[in-house]
Amino acid sequence: MRLAVNIDHIATLRNARNEHNPDPVEAALLAEKSGAVGIVCHLREDRRHIRDHDLAALRKAVTTKLDLEMAMTDEMGAIAVATMPELITLVPEKREELTTEGGFAIERHFNRLVDFLEPIKGAGIEISLFIEAEQRAIDLAEKAGADLVELHTGAYALKTGEEQAIELKKIRQAAVYAKSLGLRVVAGHGLNYENIAPFRDIEEIEEVSIGHALIARAAFVGIPAAVREMLDIIN
């Protein structure tokens, strides 16, 4: 299983003082050198952490894979085509939320989604949709032309015991189904050093995206050690 590192909260820390450090690009390079196969950043409409100049700098610096998380807006579509990340991941976005709270409402926005994705796919950028682990959402993702889906693991992360086991089963079944349709499968949201291990046994999930937990750990041990510790668990 591969690891992609979300570096948004390096920018959160920097923005707390409106200064230049810590630098998200430096964090991204350290993560890459330590074994991450991709760097994830979410350019939110309110620019609360990653900002436009960060995205431009990351595009120049990242040599593995840059995954731009973004809302389905005309502004973000234009930014994606101008920036040319290897991958974009469409996520729902609410200004009042602390973090992404659920999967993209693909059925509600399907017609708009197909039109929105056309120029991005035409530019050669891969498409991922952040969705709930549900068959209907997977069917629509495939129909819309997604290359891969990121299964939302937030409910799993919030539960314990038997309830968590039920959520894990849903994720496993969704991963198997998505793979059967020819979609690549990744997972993310709320995953950490304590709850990630069971995902090693879901061979259909090729990659996990981890941000907050890893950056929090890095505050104590540094980014290289935090990345290596996570890789030791997932592999």
Curated annotation (Swiss-Prot):
UniProt KW Nucleotide-binding keyword: no
Q: In which pathway does it act?
A: Cofactor biosynthesis; pyridoxine 5'-phosphate biosynthesis; pyridoxine 5'-phosphate from D-erythrose 4-phosphate: step 5/5
* Annotated site residue numbers, Transition state stabilizer: 150
- List, in alphabetical order, the Gene Ontology terms for molecular function in this entry: pyridoxine 5'-phosphate synthase activity
Compartment(s): Cytoplasm
One short Pfam name that applies is: PdxJ
Its main localization is cytoplasm
Q: How does it assemble?
A: Homooctamer; tetramer of dimers.
* General function of this protein: Catalyzes the complicated ring closure reaction between the two acyclic compounds 1-deoxy-D-xylulose-5-phosphate (DXP) and 3-amino-2-oxopropyl phosphate (1-amino-acetone-3-phosphate or AAP) to form pyridoxine 5'-phosphate (PNP) and inorganic phosphate.
This chain belongs to the protein called Pyridoxine 5'-phosphate synthase
Q: From which source organism is this entry?
A: Chlorobium phaeovibrioides (strain DSM 265 / 1930)
